[in-house]
Amino acid sequence: MQIDGFKVDGIANIERANLRIEDLCALIAPNGYGKSNVLRAIEFGVKFISAEEAERRQMLSGRWMSINTATYGKDFSFEMAGRINMNGEEQQFVYSYQLAWASEGSEGRVVAESLKMKRSTDQRYRQLINRAETDNCLIVPSAAGRCNKPFDVPSNLLALSAIARSAGMFLNGVASQIYGIQVPNLETLDNPESYFSVGGGKGIEILGGMTLSEYLYRLKTEDEGNYAILVDGLMQLIPNMEEFSPEVVSLPGGQQIYDVRIKEKYCARPTTIAQLSSGSKRMIFLFTLCIAARRQSVPMIMLEEPENSVHPRMIENLLLTMQNYAEDTKILMTSHSPYLMRYLKPSQMYFGLPKNDGLAHFAQVDPSKLKYLYKYAGDLELTFGEYMFDFMLDVEDDSEMMEKYFIQQ
């Protein structure tokens, strides 16, 4: 399973966010602009696919409905494009749906839904699910069939979800793969100190609810191959670290506590990871999340501001190491750091356009304008990312500049 892109609209302060996902991508904007809302919108869209009845009702209740005057009450739209393997052959898919939020006297419901697929040799997509209205859903019943068989499905349930739960249906194999997609929005804004707490600390969902220290110990004792990969990556990330050893201590009464012992260069003996710098702990935290996603074949993870607490000189190494070791897991992150931007390609960056309308508008630089921006950056002896950080401040309230240099969605 691979994810190639998302489109989201009509949630929080998001209007028409269209993201093409590379191995590593970043949403770049000032604080309070809406970067986190884009991640939450994607999380919401993926989560609704596999949500149970009570959770669907709660999600449709309108908590995330846009209250911006320009988009108030607008339906939520979600589209996900990617590739899945069917019978040994890779196929492209585009799955989308639209939800009407619950309002006074009206329950939330599915308004529209579509699933299209094609093989790499096909010119056109084949329609597999076509739900033009809440109560009007058509599906493909067989390999040779057309998308013309009526399919009854409750108003607040996606047809794809119903098919994934029905083992005997023709589309079950396709639907089950999309239904099972995980795109975790990881809590990387938190101080990593709590995740390494010897006394227990906070469990993390992608780590099976374990603390980081316990997960690292389980990895060491149960998955030697991935543990070796993790240690190799950490030694590259933190050159002063000479030894890395997750440990368990059994206490009277059967209780166990977990710790990670670190031996640093110039230190006479190992110490607990709690004594490591915040930046080093954060790099261990982020890299472990990437390894966990890799082990579970998670197609994409979302991270908030990975540069926090990390020295600017270490950011490039952190990005490269995370990207290389995550393998097929793509990374979508948020950032407001010019130091991080200097290590990204233009195709990896989505900039928040300062249109001052309360909505989050994210766009990429128009490829035809890159040569001019690179020249301007070179004249000032800046990297492209550094120049763009200042450029975004200059285009505020200048709609002509935004239209000239950015792809309009």
Predicted regions, residues:
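GG-anchored amphipathic helix commonly corresponding to the ABC/SMC/Rad50 NBD signature/C-loop
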Residues: 257-267, 272-303, 313-315
